């Protein structure tokens, strides 16, 4: 009984992870959001975000 419950839980977690990965792959974002790497060769930060020099991360800036 415990084994079947664990199997169902892990199966649902795997299904969720695969669907999230597919969603990210299909949206193909053209800009970097919060804590995304930025700089040379990387996509620019989205609106309301700025690339912080030294950290090279997109940080929210009003």
Curated annotation (Swiss-Prot):
InterPro entries: Huwentoxin-1 (IPR011696). Expressed by the venom gland. Residues 1-21 form the signal peptide. It holds the Pfam family Toxin_12. Disulfide bonds join 31-46, 38-51, 45-58. One of its GO terms (molecular function) is sodium channel regulator activity. The presence of a 'disulfide through disulfide knot' structurally defines this protein as a knottin. Inhibits voltage-gated sodium channels, preferentially subtype Nav1.5/SCN5A (in cardiac myocytes), but also Nav1.6/SCN8A and Nav1.7/SCN9A (TTX-sensitive Nav in rat DRG neurons) and invertebrate Nav (in insect neurons) as well as voltage-gated potassium channels of the subtype Kv2.1/KCNB1. Is suggested to bind to site 3 of the sodium channels and inhibit the inactivation of the activated channels, thereby blocking neuronal transmission. On potassium channels, inhibits activation of channels with an IC(50) of 8.05 uM through a voltage sensor-trapping mechanism. Moderately inhibits voltage-gated sodium channels and weakly inhibits voltage-gated potassium channel. Inhibits the inactivation of rat Nav1.2/SCN2A (IC(50)=870 nM), rat Nav1.3/SCN3A (IC(50)=845 nM), rat Nav1.4/SCN4A (IC(50)=339 nM), human Nav1.5/SCN5A (IC(50)=335 nM) and human Nav1.7/SCN9A sodium channels (IC(50)=348 nM). The toxin delays the inactivation of sodium channels without affecting the activation and steady-state inactivation kinetics in the physiological range of voltages. Belongs to the neurotoxin 10 (Hwtx-1) family. 33 (Jztx-1) subfamily. This is Delta-theraphotoxin-Cg1a 1. The lineage of its organism: Eukaryota, Metazoa, Ecdysozoa, Arthropoda, Chelicerata.
């Amino acid at each position: 009984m415990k084994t079947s419950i664990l199997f169902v839980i892990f199966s649902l977690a795997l299904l969720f992870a695969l669907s999230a990965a597919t969603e990210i792959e299909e949206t193909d974002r053209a800009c970097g959001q919060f804590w995304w790497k930025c700089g040379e060769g990387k996509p620019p930060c989205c609106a309301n975000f700025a690339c912080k020099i030294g950290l090279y991360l997109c940080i929210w800036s009003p």
